Amino acid sequence: MVRVRIPATSANLGPGFDCLGMALSLYNVVQIEAADSFQIALKGDYTAGIPGDETNLVWQSMCNLWEAIGFEIPTVSLELENNIPPTRGMGSSSAAIVGGLVAANEYAGGVLSKQQILQIANRIEGHPDNVAPALLGGVTLAVTAEASVIARTVHSQPQFMALAIVPDFYLSTEKSRNVLPASISRADAVYNLSRTALLVEALIHENYELLKEGMQDRLHQNQRASLVPGLGETLQVALDSGAYGSALSGSGPTILALVSSHRAEQVSQAMVDSLAAHGLTAKAYLLSVDSEGAAVI
């Protein structure tokens, strides 16, 4: 039997569109063991809409890895514990992919390194800023160069908490991507480039007072505001209530605030109240940055 724990992730971190992501201490668990017949058992907080057959993304990812290494696809039973909210911008798809790949690799004898698994994960997912932190942990920088991914950990365990405010509605990545413009101005490109550099500096050297400016964005948050009522106001409310920085998590609708532990409660309540004023109910998760990434447990 093999069990793997996979963290949630927050991608597009601040200005780091499609390149910066963060692993969070909210986990899905994949368990695989030999069986007489194929079956999938689902458990956890979020099971609705998760396929319990061979179309399941965890299983498809497993088969992808086994085929890549020439390992005969076995007859197994899977137990999938789903605690990451799906279609909310917290990396549920990446967790399924990475969890399936890591579990399949371990089941086959651990023949691939994490860097090799990362390449397969990116080919399946297409967004390295989600799969890299899910696999490696911490805050990661990931870029695609000539069809391969280069990923490095910017900081494995920053000394702040991550407050994820999760509105009670689904938002698909495809719908959220469709509102983005085909091109941007030079001014907006420079704005994001400079703040991405500032964000990396703030994280590496733990200069958290720089996060307020370092997490500002012009490439996707304003464009997606129409899909998340109260987004702009809630991002500002987080800062006004004492957060170091705030951003849309992934493609949304989850909103992320980086906070000190002693300010977490007041920031959380202010953000939930802000969304409520726009007719949305939301659940707050107070999380730490996961430093390990996907792990066999």
UniProtKB/Swiss-Prot annotation:
PROSITE patterns for the chain: GHMP_KINASES_ATP (PS00627)
Keywords, sorted A to Z: Amino-acid biosynthesis, ATP-binding, Cytoplasm, Kinase, Nucleotide-binding, Threonine biosynthesis, Transferase
Pfam families listed in its UniProt record: GHMP_kinases_C, GHMP_kinases_N
Catalytic activity reported: L-homoserine + ATP = O-phospho-L-homoserine + ADP + H(+)
Any one Gene Ontology cellular component term annotated for this protein: cytoplasm
Localisation: Cytoplasm
Annotated metabolic or biological route of this protein: Amino-acid biosynthesis; L-threonine biosynthesis; L-threonine from L-aspartate: step 4/5
Top-level taxon: Bacteria
InterPro entries: GHMP_kinase_C_dom, GHMP_kinase_C_sf, GHMP_kinase_N_dom, GHMP_knse_ATP-bd_CS, Homoserine_kinase, Ribosomal_Su5_D2-typ_SF, Ribsml_uS5_D2-typ_fold_subgr
Amino-acid biosynthesis is among the record's keywords: yes
Gene Ontology biological-process entries: threonine biosynthetic process
Sequence positions that bind ATP: 85-95
Gene3D superfamilies: 3.30.230.10, GHMP kinase, C-terminal domain
Enzyme class of the recorded protein, top EC level: transferase
Any one Gene Ontology molecular-function term assigned to this protein's record: ATP binding
Entry EC number(s): 2.7.1.39
Disulfide bonds listed in the record: none
Family membership noted in the UniProt record: Belongs to the GHMP kinase family. Homoserine kinase subfamily.
Function summary: Catalyzes the ATP-dependent phosphorylation of L-homoserine to L-homoserine phosphate.
Name listed for the protein in its UniProt record: Homoserine kinase
Lineage, top ranks: Bacteria, Bacillati, Bacillota, Clostridia, Eubacteriales
